[in-house]
A protein has these predicted regions:
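Glycine-rich phosphate-binding loop and adjoining beta1-alpha1-beta2 segment
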Residues: 1-7
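Conserved beta-strand segments of alpha/beta enzyme cores
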Residues: 9-11, 58
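Short, flexible loop segments at the rims of nucleotide/cofactor-binding pockets, characterized by
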Residues: 11-13, 35
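Conserved SAM/SAH-binding loop
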Residues: 13-22
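Glycine-rich phosphate/adenylate-binding loop
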Residues: 27-31, 35-185
């Protein structure tokens, strides 16, 4: 739908994202979209997307629990956005939620792609995450964004935005200084 609406010719490439793909300037992604089910996979993505030479400008990560989800659009490296000119870049999911990188987050629950996972995940939690992710991409393509993430709780029937706002990021524990080139002299 995004291709049709915006006249794009994107291809989805569902494959393991490793260091060679991250730096492949011929085919490396501009936007990496991840839906992983282990801390190890997310650590590998984090390492590959943050490495020098990575082509990915954005990282859209979707994660879920039994009745909740987080959808976060971040930037592994600085990229000029008018709304961020003083702060450099959008924090990624692994910066907002560093516990997602920790080994104890590993579990033996079935994969998101396995039918039996419905016993450990709500039936519609993945659908909700995908809908919010699609909305974030739609807004990004249309112009400046005011939110770069959403936290979803299906049990309470609530969703909350993650605003593009350094004060909000501080509540997540992010203390980022302005990039050197943007500091007042």
């Amino acid at each position: 739908r995004l291709n049709q609406y915006f006249g794009l010719d994107w291809d989805a490439v569902p494959q393991h994202y490793d260091a060679s793909l991250a730096t492949d300037h011929g085919s490396g992604p501009s936007i990496a979209i991840s839906c992983v089910d282990s801390a190890r996979s997310r650590r590998d993505l984090h390492r590959n997307l943050f490495q020098r030479g990575s082509r990915a400008t954005y990282w859209l990560d979707l994660g879920n629990t039994e009745s909740g989800a987080q959808v976060v659009l971040g930037q592994p490296k600085p990229y000029p956005l008018p709304e961020l000119q003083e702060w450099g870049r959008l924090p990624c999911v692994t910066e907002l939620f560093p516990q997602l990188l920790e080994e104890q987050q590993e579990d033996d629950a079935p994969s998101c792609s396995v039918r039996i996972s419905l016993q450990s995940q709500g039936l519609f939690v993945n659908d909700m995450a995908v809908r919010w992710a699609s909305q974030l991409l739609y807004e990004l393509f249309r112009g400046p964004i005011r939110q770069h993430g959403v936290l979803v709780n299906l049990s309470s029937k609530r969703s909350g935005p993650i605003d593009v706002n350094p004060a909000v990021w501080k509540r997540f524990g992010i203390r980022r200084r302005k990039p050197r080139g943007l500091q007042a002299e």
